[in-house]
Amino acid sequence: MKGDKKVIQHLNKILGNELIAINQYFLHSRMWNDWGLKRLGAHEYHESIDEMKHADKLIERILFLEGLPNLQDLGKLLIGENTQEMLQCDLNLELKATKDLREAIVHCEQVHDYVSRDLLKDILESEEEHIDYLETQLGLIQKVGLENYLQSHMHEDD
């Protein structure tokens, strides 16, 4: 089914954000695990997998619309050097992604592509949940201090 060119452009832009997130979150996960912060590492690993699932759905949709998924133009990863920076980098990426998602949703509405719109709304909901998690973690660091925060994230949840 031939899709709207601008919808395909939006889907590819969102796909690019997801590809950045997959790699960024995966690296952050491994860094936290290496530092002994197993709870943070496990959570970040699952976020990376969620982003991979989003990318998969976007690729399927782009192909269905007879577009070409762009997996080559990988943007810059935002890699922190410490836990607080890493959380902030993830938050910055998610805030950009949600802005792009909202713009894409508006366009899909305008051209009556409700299937793409619904896919993007599902991804937006997931990204908003991640933003809430990241804001909560950064808030906890402010409330309990970095050392207490880090100590509470040394062991994985059972």
Swiss-Prot record:
The keyword Nucleotide-binding does not apply. Changing residue 81 to A: Assembles into normal BFR with wild-type ability to oxidize Fe(2+) and store Fe(3+), 3.2-fold decrease in rate of iron release from BRF, greatly reduced affinity for Bfd. Small molecules designed to bind BfrB at the Bfd binding site (derivatives of 4-aminoisoindoline-1,3-dione) cause cell death in model biofilms, and are bacteriostatic in planktonic cells, suggesting these compounds are potential antibiotics. Model biofilms were tested in strains PAO1, PA_1081725 and PA_1076058. SUPFAM superfamilies: Ferritin-like (SSF47240). Each BfrB homodimer binds 1 heme group coordinated by an axial ligand from each subunit. K(+) binds at residues 148, 151. Induction: 24-fold increase in transcription in response to iron treatment. Keywords: Cytoplasm, Heme, Ion transport, Iron, Iron storage, Iron transport, Metal-binding, Oxidoreductase, Potassium, Transport. Its cofactor is heme b. GO terms for cellular component: cytosol; ferritin complex. Its EC number is 1.16.3.1. GO terms for biological process: intracellular iron ion homeostasis; iron ion transport. Residues 1-145 form the Ferritin-like diiron domain. Transmembrane segments: none annotated. Disruption phenotype: No growth phenotype in iron-sufficient conditions, cells do not store detectable iron under any conditions tested, cells secrete less pyoverdin siderophore and deplete iron from the medium slowly. Very low amounts of FtnA-only BFR complexes accumulate in vivo at low O(2) levels. Gene3D superfamilies: 1.20.1260.10. GO terms for molecular function: ferric iron binding; ferroxidase activity; heme binding; iron ion binding; iron ion sequestering activity. It catalyses: 4 Fe(2+) + O2 + 4 H(+) = 4 Fe(3+) + 2 H2O; Fe(2+)(in) = Fe(2+)(out). Heme b binds at residue 52. It is found in: Cytoplasm. InterPro entries: Bacterioferritin, Ferritin-like, Ferritin-like_diiron, Ferritin-like_SF, Ferritin_DPS_dom. The major iron-storage protein, part of the heterooligomeric bacterioferritin (BFR) complex. The ferroxidase center binds Fe(2+), oxidizes it using dioxygen to Fe(3+), and participates in the subsequent Fe(3+) oxide mineral core formation within the central cavity of the BFR protein shell. Can store up to 600 iron atoms per bacterioferritin protein molecule. The bacterioferritin (BFR) complex is formed of 24 subunits (FtnA and BfrB) arranged as 12 homodimers. The holocomplex contains about 8.7% Fe and 8.0% phosphate. A pure BfrB BFR is a hollow shell with an external diameter of 118 Angstroms and an internal diameter of 73 Angstroms that binds 12 heme molecules and up to 600 Fe(3+) ions per subunit. The BfrB-only BFR has twenty-four ferroxidase pores which serve as a conduit for Fe(2+). Belongs to the bacterioferritin family. The unstable catalytic diiron-binding site within each subunit (Fe1 and Fe2, ferroxidase center) also serves as a pore for iron uptake; the ferroxidase center is labile. In the iron-loaded BRF crystal structure additional stably-bound iron ions are seen inside close to the ferroxidase pore. Mutagenesis of residues reveals other stably bound Fe cations in the interior of the BFR shell; they may represent a pathway followed by Fe(3+) to the central iron storage core. This is Bacterioferritin BfrB. It comes from Pseudomonas aeruginosa (strain ATCC 15692 / DSM 22644 / CIP 104116 / JCM 14847 / LMG 12228 / 1C / PRS 101 / PAO1). The gene is bfrB.
